[in-house]
Amino acid sequence: MKNTVLTFKQAKEEKRRLSMLTAYDYSMAKIIDESGVNGILIGDSLGMVIKGEDDTLAVTMDEIIYHTKAVKKGAKNALIVSDMPFLSYHVSIEQAVLNAGRLIKEGGANAVKLEGGANVAAQIKAIVDAQIPVMGHIGLTPQSVNAFGGFKVQGKSESAAKQLIDDAVLIEKAGAFSIVLEGIPEKVAELITNAVSIPTIGIGAGKYCDGQILVYQDMLGMFNDFVPKFVKQYANVGNVMREAISSYVKEVQAGDFPEEKHTFKIDENELKKLY
């Protein structure tokens, strides 16, 4: 059954936890979708895990649209949410609505996500008024990495925590259907979750959120050089892939691949005509 914004609303009302993962291409979207997640985010995290950048700031609208198209073809049941990249909604409300519309019309997304609190409430309202569902995102917002001075946990003081709660309430009033809470103390996330009637989706925000989201490369253990504190690795796919590829290389070098069962035949009479 296709997940929609109503699915998310009903899940909170019925106290059912929501699961989300990122995806950036057809193959992974298909596997993730078949595994039963409620939503797939085409995140601007692709700048880091696909392009190898140090942050998300260089990701463009065209790149998000390209990857959204691919994910759309692989995911039949998950709600497809596309990130609005840095500076795609900051300049003006008109710009925000037009770019959100591109993600829906050109990419095929079901909803868009943008970062910020009170400072983007007007953009959220305008996008929602254009009949485009919006997912909010507060806390450690990666597009603000330079303003934060790095990827640092947010909401650790009373004033900062109160600001996050106020931002969440404003985001709900603006019409968002859910909010991502990233990199904030667990108890602060619980307060936010109880303060709003829309579902909260946590990443590094503890167990009291209405749902969880992770970058799939992190939870599958594809990278060994850095594992965020909030990530649980459910597999070590990186090692499995390296071992498989190493075996392939060795077999090719030794002449053991391809075997006879991997090859195609030609009729002997036809073959003789070639000599």
Swiss-Prot record:
Associated pathway: Cofactor biosynthesis; (R)-pantothenate biosynthesis; (R)-pantoate from 3-methyl-2-oxobutanoate: step 1/2
Job of this protein: Catalyzes the reversible reaction in which hydroxymethyl group from 5,10-methylenetetrahydrofolate is transferred onto alpha-ketoisovalerate to form ketopantoate.
Enzyme active site: E182 (proton acceptor)
GO cellular component: cytoplasm
InterPro entries xref list: Pantoate_hydroxy_MeTrfase, Pyrv/PenolPyrv_kinase-like_dom, Pyrv_kinase-like_dom_sf
CDD domains in the cross-refs: KPHMT-like
GO molecular function: 3-methyl-2-oxobutanoate hydroxymethyltransferase activity; magnesium ion binding
Protein name, as recorded: 3-methyl-2-oxobutanoate hydroxymethyltransferase
Enzyme Commission number(s) of this protein: 2.1.2.11
NCBIfam families: panB, PRK00311.1
